[in-house]
Amino acid sequence: MRHYELMVILDPSLDERTVAPSLENFLNVIRNDGGSVEKVDVWGRRRLAYEIDKQAEGIYVVLDLNSEPASVKELDRQLNLNETVLRTKVLRRVVEPRKAARVARAAAKAKNRPEASV
């Protein structure tokens, strides 16, 4: 399983309250293949940097997913076929190394170094 972040820009004519339930149909592609949806973050209506399909605004939604690459590709394909979706962008999320492990290694190195004489 890989970690992904998916940003979707939807048509602003949609009601913002119906955005998350309408995305659930698409997210079943991920769930049916054994993946999981960690977070659905609806940013709401925002102004676009440039017009897309003669729209100056869009409803932004950011999703955090754990899934196989084939499932994410199928989800992206289905979203692009939907007329209410203006744009999609799938990014592979980089998992940060644990800070605790880095701190422990640094402490171990400092402990093994001889004290400097003044």
Curated annotation (Swiss-Prot):
One of its GO terms (biological process) is translation. It comes from the Bacteria. GO terms for molecular function: small ribosomal subunit rRNA binding; structural constituent of ribosome. InterPro entries: Ribosomal_bS6, Ribosomal_bS6_sf, Ribosomal_S6_plastid/chlpt, Transl_elong_EF1B/ribsomal_bS6. This is Small ribosomal subunit protein bS6. Belongs to the bacterial ribosomal protein bS6 family. The gene is rpsF. CDD domains: bS6 (cd00473). Keywords: Ribonucleoprotein, Ribosomal protein, RNA-binding, rRNA-binding. Pfam families: Ribosomal_S6. The keyword Ribosomal protein applies. Binds together with bS18 to 16S ribosomal RNA. One of its GO terms (cellular component) is ribonucleoprotein complex.
